[in-house]
A protein has these predicted regions:
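Active-/binding-site microenvironments in catalytic and ligand-binding cores
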Residues: 1-219
């Protein structure tokens, strides 16, 4: 029997994912009581309009997030988002914030997702979450591209050093078609590299980023 490991934060109305971006909100179109009248007491439904920034909760970046003429959410290949073999790299005890290529030495990464556990998600929904964050260096990202990784996730507030306006991690990874997933959580629950990762956004044409329900299936 399969077991599932949740890797996404729950989205709650008004929560903050990134400084300066609006929190999600739900606008009720009609509720159970109102719909009961429409269906003459035979059924009832709730329908709401959900308003959220693409960068809400745990989300993936398409290349269009960084580059004007690049593939958007609707162009992402499912084989690079679902049923992925993965390698988790634990970096809770790193020296300094920047995670360099040595963290991935000797790992077989071709065609796989790389999940970087920093422990930063322990600060989720606190002001400390937006302190200077753990990130991947430009050299680390080039290493991952050269090694053939197809998906890179991290449990930090950003895969880049937020003080570096060049955003080299986004530039290198998305520029080479590697999907990014930020604000992951519960990576400590992955005790081995067994199982398959799934993290699929909706196929929104013209969309650049969108929340995902990221999880691992253990057989």
């Amino acid at each position: 029997m399969s077991r599932f490991i949740e890797l996404s934060h729950t989205i709650r109305e008004g929560m903050k994912t990134f400084p300066g971006l609006p929190g999600p909100r739900s606008v009720l179109l009609f509720d159970h009581a109102g719909s009961e009248r429409v269906y003459k007491g035979q059924a009832e439904f709730l329908i709401a309009s959900l308003h959220l920034c693409g960068n809400t909760g745990t989300y993936v970046d398409s290349p269009y997030h960084r580059f004007r003429e690049a593939p958007d959410l609707s162009a992402l290949k499912l084989e690079r988002l679902a049923d992925l073999a993965f390698v988790k790299v634990r970096q809770r005890d790193r020296l300094g914030r920047g995670i360099g290529p040595s963290a991935f030495d000797g790992l077989s990464l071709k065609g796989k997702a790389v999940l970087v556990e920093t422990g930063w998600s322990d600060r989720w929904q606190t002001q400390e979450y937006f302190d200077p964050n753990p990130f991947l260096t430009e050299d680390a990202c080039r290493y991952l591209v050269d090694a053939g990784a197809v998906f890179v996730g991290i449990d930090s507030a950003n895969i880049d050093d937020m003080s570096d306006l060049r955003r080299p991690a986004h530039t290198v990874l998305l520029g080479n078609g590697v999907t990014i997933c930020e604000h992951m959580t519960n990576l400590a629950a992955l005790q081995t590299n067994e199982g398959r990762l799934h993290a699929v956004p909706i196929a929104w044409q013209g969309g650049a980023t969108f929340p995902v329900r990221a999880y691992v299936v253990l057989s």
